[in-house]
C-alpha cells in the first residue's frame, strides 16, 4: 500500500505520490517531463515537449463548453532539493518518501516538493477525470523555475491559444495572487591567494536555523547562516585571535534562506580562551537577536587536526571576512502602497570556496525595477571594492497588478460561492512565472492560487491535506464556470 492511499482527493494524491517517486530537482526534470509526455499519449492528448523539457498539453472542451473561453493551467516541474544533515538521499537521483503526519503530508528528511508538484498533480488529475466539465484546456508545465524561471523564459508559446491563465504556485489558501516581484541572480567572485600555514584546523558550524523561502518568508526576521559567519570572524578579530581561512560553505540554493554554514580556520594553537570568549559572545548575541525566530541557533567548534595547510593569506582572509560582514541581505524596503508587502530584498543563499576564489550567490527581488537595479549596483560596487567581480543572470520581470481582469472576477465569484466570504487579493514578493508569461503573450489574463503549503524549500515542508481537497473543489468550480 502506498503512503498516501486513502487520502482525498484520491486522484490528486495518487499523481502527487507518482511525482514524488521521480527525481525532479532543478536541472533534473527530464524523467518527470517524460512521464507527463507518456501520460498525455496514454490519454490521447496533444503534447509538445521542447528541448529543455517544458511541456504544453492540450485537452478539448467537454460537451457544452465548446464556446467558452479556453483556460491555461500552469505550474512548474522542478523542486528545491534540500535535506537534513543526516539524510542519506541524493535528491538528484533518489525518490522522495512522502508520509502522512496528522493532517499534513511531509517527506522523510527532505523537502516535499509540494512547490510545485501539487500543481502538476492537480493538472494531471483534471486531465485524467471523466466527470469534470471544462472549456478547452492547455496545461503549461515548465522546468528550472526555482533557479531563475529559466524554463518559462526560454519556452516558445507560438501555439498557445488561451488568454486566461491559472497559475497554481501560491501557498496560502484564500489568497488570490494578482502581482509579484521581479528578480535577478547575482554571483560575487572574490579572488583569493593561498599560502602554507601551520597550526590547528578548527571548523565552526552555524546550525539550527529555520531557513525558508526567500520570497515568501524573507520578512519573518530569520537569521542568515552565511551572513553570521561574517559576525563570527569579526568577533575573533576583535578578540585578538590570529587565524587564516581554510574552507567556506553554506546554503543550498540562492532562493532559500540558508539554515547552515561553516568556515574552517587555521589557528596557531587551536581553541584558545580568546576563541572560547568569542564563541560565548557570539552565542549571547544570537540568542538576544534571534531567540524568537531561530530558537535553536547554535555555533559548534570542532578541532580537525594539526599540520601544514594551504590556507588563505592574511589579505584574502580579511577580504573574505569583510564580504561576509558587509554584504546586504534580507528585507531592504517595504511597499509604501501595499501594507505588509516586501518591496525589495536580497538573499545571500550560497557560499563556497575553491583554490582560486570565494563565491557568494544572491537572489535579488523587487516590485520596483529601479530599486532592483540599485541593489544590484550596490552588491557589484561592494564586490569591486573588495577586489572581486560579479555575474548577473536569471533576470525576470515583475508581474504588474491589472486593474481589470475577467479571470480575477471569475475566481472571486467562485470563491465567494464556495467559501461564503471574499478572498484576499494580494501581490507577493516571491517571483512567479506570470510575469514572464504576461510579457511574452499579449493580452494574457493571469491569477495565481494554491493550497496551504508550510515551510517550503526546507525539510520541514508540509502540505495541508484538507486545504488540498478544498482547493481541488475550487479549481473544479473555476473550470466549470460559465460566463
Language model: regions and residue ranges:
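A short beta-alpha structural unit
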Residues: 17-21, 264, 298-310, 347-351, ...
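Zn-dependent metallopeptidase/amidohydrolase metal-coordination segment
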Residues: 9-12, 336, 343-358, 363, ...
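Active-site metal-coordination/substrate-binding segment of hydrolases
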Residues: 65-156, 162-163, 198-201, 314-317, ...
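His/Asp/Glu-rich mid-to-C-terminal helical/loop segments that flank catalytic regions of hydrolases
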Residues: 158, 222-239, 267-272, 316-325, ...
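Active-site-adjacent substrate-binding region
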Residues: 222-227, 231-248, 401-444
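A conserved active-site cap/scaffold subdomain adjacent to cofactor or substrate pockets
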Residues: 254-330, 334
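Acidic/His- and Gly-rich active-site-bordering loop/insert found
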Residues: 2-104
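Fold-level recognition of mixed alpha/beta catalytic cores in primary-metabolism enzymes, strongest
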Residues: 134-225, 233, 237
